[in-house]
């Protein structure tokens, strides 16, 4: 049985196109460690060969997973390495999965060591899991507190800083791709800085938003493009009802908790990181190009003539019968000229390019037993898949924690983000798909032709916006996300915490469309100009009381949480 398998590590659709090739060029750390990471193995295609696919043989494998005592394990994750294809074991510890013959199975379960097993020629597997005490003692963020993995009963997946830094992306969410079972991540478009569509629990609603709730250091954040991936310590993904219930209806689609890096007592550490990545458009929609379009015109004329006299299959039109019959509208060339020269125009290819992303980060952290700090700065420049589309993002972060005494602890975080986006109109790519390829975008002197279609005078040249002064859309955004907290521990096991957050956003958008831009020429209007400014400010005040106590010889524990949250 053959099956078409496509592995895409970066989903980025540029108005119908997707970017699927991403690789690191170089990396630099404070220790002057330089590494070159090989290009990810992915399915891609060039502009002329849209249909390239990777075809591989698949087979069905079965297995039984047991623990160290020989008992079957329920709910063990079985994932095909590098993909989101996977399953979990049933009540008898068994699983069945369709996999490529050369696949590697990743077997994982909380509290046990992860195993990588090559499938090879085997069809049945007997797997014994080993407990991992170090993992069991790790803590994960759940709701308004933390819990050891050995005590965790809900469905929680963790992505650590090391996994995030391996992902060459301006958006940290893409580090979770293929690492969290059941998580689907797609980039909304190929524009620079485009958002990420995250689907954690499937499509629960046709009309409503299915995105999970995203929290940064316990506060609702929203856009993940504002966060520098290098500032993130860990991401916890809460999926089941027991883990997300505390967030009410906002957690109905799952919750992603992002914890940023904080200072640690000890020597001051300086880290410098840099990388360059490239996104390439692929899966470009097919259009009738060149002689295929001519063939379509011939077939259409033959069909029309057959209908006219009722004699089917007797008409055989010539190229001269279908080309040169259009109105032409005074164009400096004829369709026959294009046909004879073979100088057809691939409009989508003229609009697209490879997107280059550069990222640079510098962080300084350290402190004493009482006071710790973390300071970081980042700069990212991302090029979109359309020409003249570019986003520049600059981040600054400061976090300070101070232990006043054994009872009182205070701290603060400040995250500042500045974005400058020279944005392209998404409509031009769609317009390029219905342009006739039997046409030229420029005349013999290199001047752009406003309306190059020999059939429809209203069809504007989709390259018009590339001309200097024809189109300009600049969006400047500033965001300050500041949090302060006070924490009291009057007795052992009892923690009272109050947290206050201010989220201030300012956006300025300027838009100019010349009368000879694509949209204005298409609609026969004059030039258009707009200047918009928006300000947003949100306040969040959380108060929580946590009490944890052990009893019964430390075999049992009781956790009590009381709290209130106010948002304005």
Region locations from a protein language model:
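Active-site and adjacent substrate-binding regions of carbohydrate-active enzymes
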Residues: 493
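Short, small/polar-rich motifs associated with maturation and membrane association
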Residues: 1-397, 402, 409-411, 481-482
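Surface-exposed loop/interface segments of Gram-negative outer-membrane beta-barrel transport/assembly proteins
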Residues: 264-343, 384-391, 395-481, 497-499, ...
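A short, polar/charged loop-to-alpha-helix boundary motif
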Residues: 489
């Amino acid at each position: 049985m053959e099956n078409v398998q496509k592995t895409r590590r970066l989903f980025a659709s540029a108005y119908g196109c997707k970017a699927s090739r991403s690789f690191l060029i170089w990396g630099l750390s404070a220790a002057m460690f330089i590494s070159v990471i090989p290009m990810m193995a992915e399915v891609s295609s060039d502009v002329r060969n849209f249909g390239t696919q990777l075809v591989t043989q698949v087979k069905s494998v079965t297995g039984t997973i047991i623990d160290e005592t020989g008992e079957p394990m329920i709910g063990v994750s079985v994932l095909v390495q590098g993909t989101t294809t996977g399953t979990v074991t049933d009540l008898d510890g068994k699983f069945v999965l369709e996999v490529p013959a050369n696949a590697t199975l990743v077997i994982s379960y909380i509290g046990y060591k992860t195993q990588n097993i090559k499938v090879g020629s085997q069809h049945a597997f007997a797997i014994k899991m080993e407990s991992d005490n170090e993992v069991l003692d790790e803590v994960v963020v759940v709701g308004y507190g933390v819990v050891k993995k050995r005590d965790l009963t809900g469905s929680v997946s963790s992505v650590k800083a090391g996994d995030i830094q391996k992902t060459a992306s301006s958006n940290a969410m893409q580090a979770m791709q293929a690492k969290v079972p059941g998580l689907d991540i797609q980039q909304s478009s190929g524009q620079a800085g485009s958002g990420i569509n995250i689907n954690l629990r499937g499509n629960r609603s046709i009309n409503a938003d299915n995105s999970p709730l995203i929290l940064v250091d316990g506060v609702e954040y929203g856009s993940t493009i504002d966060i520098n991936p290098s500032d993130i310590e860990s991401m916890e993904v809460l999926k089941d009802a027991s883990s997300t219930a505390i967030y009410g209806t906002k957690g109905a689609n799952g919750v992603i908790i992002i914890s940023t890096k904080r200072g640690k007592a000890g020597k001051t550490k300086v880290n410098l990181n840099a990388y360059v990545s490239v996104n390439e458009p692929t899966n470009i929609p097919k259009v009738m190009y060149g002689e295929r379009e001519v063939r379509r015109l011939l077939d259409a004329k033959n069909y029309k003539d057959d209908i006219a006299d009722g004699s089917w299959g007797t008409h055989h039109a010539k190229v001269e019968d279908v080309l040169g019959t259009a109105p032409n509208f005074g164009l400096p060339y004829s369709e026959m000229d294009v046909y004879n020269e073979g100088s057809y125009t691939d409009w989508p290819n003229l609009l697209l390019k490879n997107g280059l992303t550069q990222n640079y980060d510098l962080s300084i952290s350290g402190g004493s037993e009482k006071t710790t700090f973390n300071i970081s700065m980042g700069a990212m420049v991302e090029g979109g898949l359309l020409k003249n589309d570019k986003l520049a993002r600059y981040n600054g972060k400061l976090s300070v924690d101070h232990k006043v005494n054994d009872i009182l602890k205070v701290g603060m975080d400040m995250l500042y983000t500045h974005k400058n986006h020279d944005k392209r109109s998404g409509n031009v790519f769609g317009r390029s798909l219905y342009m006739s390829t039997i046409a030229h975008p420029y005349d013999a002197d290199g001047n752009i032709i406003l309306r190059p279609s020999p059939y429809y005078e209203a069809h504007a040249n989709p390259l018009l916006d590339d001309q200097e002064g024809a189109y300009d859309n600049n969006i400047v955004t500033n965001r300050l996300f500041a949090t302060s907290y006070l924490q009291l521990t009057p007795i052992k096991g009892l923690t009272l915490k109050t947290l206050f957050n201010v989220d201030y956003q300012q956006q300025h958008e300027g838009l100019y469309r010349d009368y000879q831009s694509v949209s204005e020429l298409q609609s026969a209007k004059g030039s258009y100009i707009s200047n918009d400014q928006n300000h947003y400010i949100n306040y969040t005040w959380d108060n929580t009381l946590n009490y944890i106590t052990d009893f019964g010889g430390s075999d049992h524990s009781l956790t009590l949480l009381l709290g209130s949250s106010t948002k304005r």
